[in-house]
Amino acid sequence: MNARRRGVWAVLLLAAGTAGAAPVLIDHRNVDVTRLTLPQIERAKASLHIAYGHTSHGSQLTDGMSGLVDFANGGGQGLALPENAFAWNQSGSDGALDLRDYALCDDVGYYPAWVDCTSNYLSDPAHSNVNVILWSWCGQMDDKYEAGTLTNEYLAPMAALERHFPHVAFVYMTGHVDIEDDADNKAACAAIRAWCATNDRILY
């Protein structure tokens, strides 16, 4: 892992409250925002430049982040941070986190389109400061697991992109609940989680 990627990982680790640990596996248990210090939040906003690709289900993440701004501004959980400490926008202007929502094509279920889109995006000089790529699933993850293509159409291409763009941190994601295909859905999530744990990756 090169120095630039280590630097990005360090910021993500601090933001996750798990400094010194690798891999970074974030789930529903990592929800105590009161553990974050203002210097950690400010460092993340100053250092992270994120491009996020998703369709409908992926908006839960950005909706939640917008809600977090209001939550913190209202002093939720006893927070006493400056106003809009968790603010984000498409450019990082006015001290906000640089999170380019819908920057990438569709979602990660569309292979090979998502791979080509990522490569083209990161190869564009206009995006040279982007150092985090985040892709969300819609409903295809369990289908890929059932078809035996989860590795070839998700895990392996992500690893290839990591090698091609070593200055970028790629955040892996599991999918949303799918009660109609619960077994394959859980198995796919477990496979992605195991891959990230074994290979020291970032998982959200």
Regions found by a protein language model. Name each.
Residues 64-75, 157-164, 192-202:
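Structured segments of extracytoplasmic/periplasmic soluble domains
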Residues 175-204:
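Substrate-gating cap/lid alpha-helix
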Residues 25-124:
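N-terminal carbohydrate-binding/catalytic regions of secreted carbohydrate-active enzymes
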Residues 34-37, 112-124, 149-160, 187-192:
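Alpha-helical scaffolding within the catalytic cores
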Residues 46-49, 74-79, 127-133, 163-171, ...:
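Loop/turn elements at helix/coil->beta-strand transitions in domains of secreted/extracellular proteins
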Residues 16-18:
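N-terminal signal peptide c-region/cleavage motif recognized by signal peptidases
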Residues 1-9:
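Bacterial N-terminal signal peptides that target proteins for export
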Residues 111-151, 175-178:
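Oxyanion-hole/transition-state-stabilizing segment in secreted/luminal serine hydrolases
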